[in-house]
């Protein structure tokens, strides 16, 4: 028996639940010579902004125990250049394309999505709500602002809108519920965790910005908990993200309530891990004689309530 790995995420049909995570896979098409991109459930692009950004100064990435610390600074070519080349190349892959976008104000988010909505080949928008606004405050930490961003984008978007949320909150369920009530069609849980590291040889921070975002295996239990908590309270689907290194990790997120998963650090270390994760999910379903991955979404709740 070959299990059915297909899922429906907010109306988007995915052949399997494994997506790339924004920020570690370029725009998506660059690795076509390394792995069969057609096998992926979908591609989430690196974050696109209204105007090009050079990003932060080097060093902006550092390896730490069981993870990666980064502060890239949203380096990208800007939305207009993105639709000229990367989007066109992505559309040739044949998988859903989810475009990650970020801005410093409501109007900027709306303008980016307006431009993207005029193009074919965009399956969904992922709002990076963990970046600073004009007041240097994380967007999703300002609930009224987050509501305004989501509502504004929903008015102009022709495709589903997914809110990617920061884990640095007291109650992730409240944050996810706020996103849902503002009109989000799904949420991604979670973005990186704030962290820093110091080089004891130079007595300097390992990143030029001092602090950055932690990703990798070390954050998985915390991100799984975020997915589980949010799943109890929201009705919109969840993309689980954070520390997925193998098929077993992906299944953990799905059992906790994720409909799909996005893989970041693991694909940065070895792009082929994406394919191994897809195969790993299939192997676990075969072993358990489960016909469809859809049957295990939120499965831990069914076991607890049995």
UniProtKB/Swiss-Prot annotation:
GO biological process per UniProt: 'de novo' pyrimidine nucleobase biosynthetic process; 'de novo' UMP biosynthetic process
Active site (catalytic residues): 131 (nucleophile)
Chief subcellular location: cytoplasm
Cofactor annotation: FMN
Origin superkingdom: Bacteria
GO terms for cellular component: cytoplasm
Key words of the record: Cytoplasm, Flavoprotein, FMN, NAD, Oxidoreductase, Pyrimidine biosynthesis
EC number of this enzyme: 1.3.1.14
Bound cofactor: record note: Binds 1 FMN per subunit.
Pathway connected to this protein: Pyrimidine metabolism; UMP biosynthesis via de novo pathway; orotate from (S)-dihydroorotate (NAD(+) route): step 1/1
Chain positions recorded as FMN binding sites: 22, 46-47, 128, 164, 216, 242-243, 264-265
Enzyme class: oxidoreductase
UniProt-listed PROSITE patterns: DHODEHASE_1
Subcellular locations according to the entry: Cytoplasm
Catalytic activity, reaction form: (S)-dihydroorotate + NAD(+) = orotate + NADH + H(+)
Pfam hit, one: DHO_dh
Family according to the record: Belongs to the dihydroorotate dehydrogenase family. Type 1 subfamily.
Function: Catalyzes the conversion of dihydroorotate to orotate with NAD(+) as electron acceptor.
Protein name in UniProt: Dihydroorotate dehydrogenase B (NAD(+)), catalytic subunit
Organism of derivation: Endomicrobium trichonymphae
């Amino acid at each position: 028996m070959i299990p059915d790995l297909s899922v429906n995420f907010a109306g988007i049909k995915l052949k399997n639940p494994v997506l790339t995570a924004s920020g570690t896979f370029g725009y998506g098409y660059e690795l076509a010579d390394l792995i069969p991109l057609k096998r992926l459930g979908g591609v989430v692009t690196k974050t696109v902004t209204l105007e090009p950004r050079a990003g932060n100064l080097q060093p902006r990435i550092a390896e730490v125990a069981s993870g990666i610390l980064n502060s890239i600074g949203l380096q990208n070519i800007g939305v207009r250049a993105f639709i000229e080349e990367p989007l066109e190349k992505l559309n040739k892959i044949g998988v859903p394309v989810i475009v990650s976008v970020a801005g410093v104000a409501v109007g900027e988010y709306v303008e980016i999505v307006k431009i993207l909505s005029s193009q074919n080949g965009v399956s969904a928008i992922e709002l990076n709500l963990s970046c600073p606004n004009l007041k240097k405050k994380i967007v999703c930490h300002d609930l009224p602002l987050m509501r305004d961003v989501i509502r504004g984008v929903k008015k102009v978007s022709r495709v589903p809108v997914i809110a990617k949320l920061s884990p640095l909150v007291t109650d992730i369920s409240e944050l996810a519920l706020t996103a849902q009530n503002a009109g989000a069609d799904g949420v991604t849980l979670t973005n990186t965790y704030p962290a820093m590291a110091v080089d004891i040889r130079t007595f300097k921070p390992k990143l030029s910005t001092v602090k950055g975002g932690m990703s990798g295996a070390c954050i998985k239990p915390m991100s799984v908990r975020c997915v589980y908590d949010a799943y109890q309270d929201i009705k919109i689907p969840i993309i689980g993200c954070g520390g997925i290194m193998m098929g077993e990790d992906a299944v953990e997120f799905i059992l906790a309530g994720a409909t799909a998963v996005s893989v970041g650090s693991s694909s940065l270390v070895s792009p082929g891990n994406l394919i191994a994760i897809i195969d790993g999910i299939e192997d676990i379903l075969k072993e358990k004689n489960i016909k469809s991955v859809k049957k295990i979404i939120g499965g831990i709740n069914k076991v607890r309530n049995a």
